[in-house]
Regions:
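Short, low-complexity intrinsically disordered segments enriched in A/P/G/S/L with frequent Arg
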Residues: 8, 12, 25-28
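Generic short N-terminal amphipathic or hydrophobic helices
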Residues: 1, 16, 20-22, 41
Length: 375
């Protein structure tokens, strides 16, 4: 970046030019040396966003859900309501995109055929995607997020570079295309994380690693892409990389639970080598220990060296609302990060109050309707 006075000209890695105004050089810990307000970003790289959403208040969805889950009304079973309930913040997701990431080419809004009444389906940047548009018919309906996610590369018109969002991932501060892609590659952190847990989530991650270890030699990968595995920006997040450098197998990787950049070609390649396993488990209508998660595609990307090293923890944060509701509301209000995950849980106490506080924080930073909302 070349700066003269308060104006900056940046030669973007994607091949475009970004023009901005340098508005300050505040430091937050060791993470940020400056903030740049981008007035305009011109890039030759098309980047799409994909966001998945479900409206559990839809009567037809409730009927179908009860049919396949065996859960009626408020009955309890192994299927958590928190995985599906919508707490009314989706409009802030769209407002955040328009205000803080206006450079996005297209938003692929993925549902089982639902649409919020307020959403402008005819907006030129919105592509409404029904599960039936890209998931094989024999696996529908599905209530398993990992099945919905593993077929994303089949979405019609999806750009080769895309960022995947759950509907609880929010952009709350200005963010540039280079935060997600540099030199045509996803920005990510390659770091191990030892997790001795035997939870269902961990078992699914182990399923991923079986495929990774079958196709990659860990020592060879870490030697070939040494600088990417030991990038100085990782700091203490890379400590297990040093401890496990001589270990022969890949183990659990650190997973920043937030917006994830992908190459569409990564999905296509994984399907070529692991299509049998992915197809066999696509019939799981709800989460199961036999599943493979989207972390498989991310890990494959990393092992291929198809990423640019970036400590994603420096500007993202996941807030479990069951234990950190006040910190979550404060982070949104003060825009402490670029990206946040507001992780719901069926056991949240004072649910209405917690969500009310977060809504107030969103209204503070995103009070105006976006062009995605009907007037």
């Amino acid at each position: 970046m070349i700066c003269t006075g308060k104006f900056c000209l940046e030669d973007n890695a994607s091949g475009g030019i970004g023009f901005g105004i340098l508005i300050g050089s505040p430091v937050r810990g060791a993470f940020f040396s400056r903030f740049v307000f981008y007035k305009e970003v011109i890039t030759s790289m098309d980047i799409d966003f994909v966001v998945t959403w479900v409206d559990m208040n839809d009567p037809q969805w409730q009927v179908d859900f009860a049919k396949y889950s065996g859960k009626k009304g408020n009955e309890k079973n192994g299927v958590s309501e928190a995985r599906f309930r919508d707490y009314g913040f989706l409009r802030y997701w769209f407002r955040g995109v328009e205000k803080f990431a206006p450079w996005v080419r297209k938003i692929h809004f993925v549902t089982s055929g639902q649409k919020p009444e307020w959403l402008d389906a005819h907006h030129p940047k919105i592509h409404l995607v029904n599960h039936r548009d890209y998931i094989p018919e024999e696996f529908l309906p599905t209530y398993n997020s990992v099945v919905i996610e593993r077929y994303l590369h089949r979405i019609p018109g999806l750009a080769d570079h895309f960022v995947y969002f759950n509907d609880d991932f929010y952009i709350i501060n200005r963010i540039s295309p280079e935060r997600f892609f540099r030199n045509g590659l996803p920005c990510d952190i390659a770091a191990f994380h030892y997790n001795p847990s035997w939870s269902q989530w961990y078992k699914r991650i182990k399923n991923n690693m079986k495929i990774i270890n079958r196709h990659f030699d860990k020592k060879e990968v870490m030697a070939r892409f040494h600088d990417k595995w030991f990038d100085e920006s990782y700091g203490s997040k890379a400590r297990w990389n040093y401890l496990l450098k001589g270990y022969g197998k890949f183990i659990t990787m650190r997973t920043p639970h937030n917006a994830q950049p992908f190459l569409k070609s990564t999905f296509e390649e994984v399907w070529e080598v692991a299509g049998k396993e992915l197809t066999q488990t696509s019939g799981n209508k709800f989460r199961a220990v036999s599943d493979y998660t989207p972390e498989l595609f991310r890990a494959w990307q990393i092992c291929r060296g198809n990423f640019e090293p970036y400590n994603t923890y420096q500007d993202t944060k996941m807030f479990p609302l069951m234990i950190r509701p006040k910190k979550a509301a404060k982070a949104v209000y003060s825009q402490s990060y670029s990206l946040v995950c507001l992780n719901d849980n069926v056991h949240i106490r004072n649910y209405a109050k917690v969500m009310g506080n977060i809504r107030e924080s969103f209204e503070h930073i995103l009070p105006e309707k976006s062009s995605f909302e009907l007037s």
